[in-house]
From Swiss-Prot:
Residues 271-317 are annotated as: Disordered. One of its GO terms (biological process) is transmembrane transport. Residues 2-243, 317-545 form the ABC transporter domain. Residues 278-293 have a biased composition (Pro residues). This is Putative ABC transporter ATP-binding protein SCO2324. It comes from Streptomyces coelicolor (strain ATCC BAA-471 / A3(2) / M145). InterPro entries: AAA+_ATPase (IPR003593), ABC_transporter-like_ATP-bd (IPR003439), ABC_transporter-like_CS (IPR017871), ABC_transpr_CbiO/EcfA_su (IPR015856), ECF_ABC_transporter_ATP-bd (IPR050095), P-loop_NTPase (IPR027417). It is found in: Cell membrane.
Amino acid sequence: MIRFEDVSVTYDGATEPTVRAVDFEVPEGELVLLAGPSGVGKSTVLGAVGGLVPHFTGGTLRGRVTVAGRDTRTHKPRELADVVGTVGQDPLSHFVTDTVEDELAYGMESLGLPPDVMRRRVEETLDLLGLSDLRSRPIATLSGGQQQRVAIGSVLTPHPDVLVLDEPTSALDPAAAEEVLAVLQRLVHDLGTTVLMAEHRLERVIQYADQVVLLPAPGEAPLIGAPAEVMAVSPVYPPVVGLGRLAGWSPLPLTIRNARRRAAPLRERLAGREIPDHTPPPSAPLPAPPAPRPVTSRWRRRGKRPENPSAPTPYAAEVRSLAVRRDRVQALRHVDLTVSPGETVALMGRNGAGKSTLLSALVGLVEPSAGSVRAGDAVPHRTAPRDLVRRVGLVPQEPRDLLYADTVAAECAAADRDADAAPGTCRALLSELLPGITDDIHPRDLSEGQRLTLALSVVLTARPPLLLLDEPTRGLDYAAKARLAGILRGLAAEGHAIVLATHDVELAAELAHRVVLLAEGEVIADGPAADVVVASPSYAPQVAKVLAPRKWLTVAQVREALT
């Protein structure tokens, strides 16, 4: 169904091909996983299937890509639209209508399908992806994960023969990700749909793959094979495979079920051994930054008096009885949360639970409808942005919101100036997080993971006492996640408070002191990470599921205990 024949792609201005010697075939009715570190060209390979590369992106494609017998060099994307449905890393770039139901119908309207067929397929897709309650909602009011489900649904309704998905579960909570992957598996098995998918969170998808195409490094030829065979030599692999490598299991397990069947000897070796703690207790607070200049004029006009911004507080962040309403949606209600200096807190919960709204309240982007919010000694929504930036930094779900320069070098230089940091500080952070990003590249030409890493570096340059991160591992491979965790752990040890909203249960297990679970805008659990995640089948990391009932969370803990 999809055939790559010795394909190389070189973008305009590049001296070397982004991908080279790509040669593989995806048979009809198979799900093939495209894996590899960040920046190796996975999105380029996916883009070539639908003709976006090179017709839209520019550059030179050598070799041949055919889809259902159509050569993508001679067929433009619109001439492949009846065969190929594509969902990229950025769902927002797909939307052309305002509401969920209209978006699901748009692709079918473009293909001229009869109204009765369109109505039936919209209803089917709403049910399949759990979108029925959102059918009339404006897309702009949805959470990132809800938008991702709508984007996937919009390419399912036309019933294409080929689905091309670039990190389709990156913004989904664990339960929603399982639902989407189950739908894809049903399409593959029952309808013969062909799926080519790139995904960094291999722990979610590896068990569904018929084959894996591994891009080991930029410009290197891919390795193709059965999932277990490729994972045995892959530089990127899920925790269950890492545990199997450590224990010497062969063949390597790809599922929790298979790993548990073979874990009894490992449990016996670990019996009585202390579980290492990789999240030391919070440290002493940082010195207080200069007092902010509050924005008070509009409050005085209303006869209100602003709260004293200099009132002492032992917390880096303090939320009391917080309620936030966004349009017609009650996003948060009765939320109480405190974060101490040096503490790392993971906000978790279903898509639309209110995690991003809570971060927005902490950085002053939304105003409480009830209750109070403090970031250190500042009231965020009443503090001038130039003062607030030195107290709290936010890396949003869409990193492009922070990037405006024409090159990586200019972006880093601006970050150094804005933070009064030594020249080269941002660049050094970027190189530590993700080596190999050149100074002269435009931020828009980076992969999603590379863009996120650049935005992280820009915010971390100011070293704010309170650091907020919204889905910080979206688009990052395991090595980049490990480097990010190391940097965040170092910041916490210096007294920085960190609050991250994430669906990445492995990151929460590795990094967080506490996990706060949100549901429908309310806090339903708040406690030590090991207690909260292990108690939940949805949020327990892979190692915890394999080695239960003891609270082992990461492969690193097991490795340290065995040495």
